[in-house]
Amino acid sequence: MSSSTSTIVAIASAAGTGGVGIVRLSGPQSRQIAVQLGVARLQPRHAHYARFRDAQGAVIDDGIALWFNAPHSFTGEDVVELQGHGSPVLLRQLVARCIELGARQARAGEFSERAFLNGKLDLAQAEAIADVIAAGDLRAARAARRALDGVFSRRVDAVAHTLTRLRIHVEAAIDFADEPLDTLGGNQVRDGLTQARTLLAQLLRDAERGRTLRDGLHAVLIGPPNAGKSSLLNALAGSDRAIVTDVAGTTRDTLHEAIQLDGFELTLVDTAGLRDGGDAIEREGMRRARAELERADLALVVLDARDPQAARAAIGDAIDAVPRQLWIHNKCDLLSDAAPLDVNAIAVSAVTGQGLEQLHIRLRELALGDGVESVDGEFSARTRHVEALRRAERHVDAADLELGFEQLELAAEELRLAHEALGEITGKISADDLLGKIFSSFCIGK
């Protein structure tokens, strides 16, 4: 439970003018402050019309007051919402009057933080509030809404419950070290490990998809000069964003273009062609291209279909660190009918459009997996969630290895670390600095 005794206030509606503006109070003085503002009577979950007044009794604004009594509110505390006209000037004056009456200005995300501390939301759900607000399209909004409804958290808890049962069996085996593991539920341990690994693998796959829906995909077009990278970016973007000429080395700097592709944002980055030599400006362009690869989720390796092997040699090991790669043979319209095509690459023509639909399909597969949703549907996730799940997966694998050598103490420690990684997602185990970073990124009124 939160130990806070302060009452906080902030504008909860969107910035700018509008038909309605909302000022939100949360804390033990919320109701008292509303009464002092001029709200004659307040009943829980009833709307009351009132004139909100300043210290001299002059009317600041008129509107509706709503009281949500603790613990039946978003934050778990007494909450009052004052709904007036959407004038930033009047809303700021109303906040200032609330502060005069004993409230303090809320920090960014403090309402959601109090909801978390009071057990109204777990940490993943609290983060989903910001994701719902920031969603760029309907698919991302629905995924964030499912995370807010607890779909992601329940699946994390299911894995954690499986690990709890495993830890009980392993700890029992440690306490009765003279007994063989099989007589202490060894089969249950092995079955539990299999179940935990399966659940984790499925959850990690779906969380990576959820992260892509939330954050999009950073795809870098890489390849030798004159392979048609800029032409391909223009074809995918549907506009002439990059300069295209027949002169090798035309692209000297990086160019970013965001496109929407089946519910997620794909950021394409055109880069300078990689080759030996070149002038100082071109060499700087190649350095920037390699720097973009270090941040890439996906490398789109664009080669000239007429001589892909020579083009491949020019790239060298530049793409080795990129987790996902897609090889594209461009200019396939210039090939003779008898020319062989690499079955592992996609043949396209940025000029004629040949193969672009197949490229779109492959990009969707790389971004969102096989397209098969879980029973609960897609949910939004963040990079920290994916990293925590990967750590949990590594620790479960390590526990399996230690159990194979009957190193029970080491296996128990690995399972504990896996459990801890899952707890970081929902906030059951969280460092104070992590909470501070998460909630400080929220809107003031959230």
UniProtKB/Swiss-Prot annotation:
Segments crossing the lipid bilayer: none
Binding residues for Mg(2+): 230, 251
Residues the record lists as binding (6S)-5-formyl-5,6,7,8-tetrahydrofolate: 24, 81, 120, 446
Keywords: Cytoplasm, GTP-binding, Hydrolase, Magnesium, Metal-binding, Nucleotide-binding, Potassium, tRNA processing
Binding, GTP: 226-231, 245-251, 270-273
The record's free-text note on cofactor binding: Binds 1 potassium ion per subunit.
Positions that bind K(+): 226, 245, 247, 250
Keyword Transferase annotated: no
Stored InterPro entries: G_TrmE, GTP-bd, GTP-bd_TrmE_N, GTPase_MnmE, MnmE_dom2, MnmE_helical, P-loop_NTPase, Small_GTP-bd
GO biological process: tRNA methylation; tRNA wobble uridine modification
NCBIfam families the record matches: mnmE_trmE_thdF, PRK05291.1-3, small_GTP
Protein name: tRNA modification GTPase MnmE
Organism, as annotated: Xanthomonas oryzae pv. oryzae (strain PXO99A)
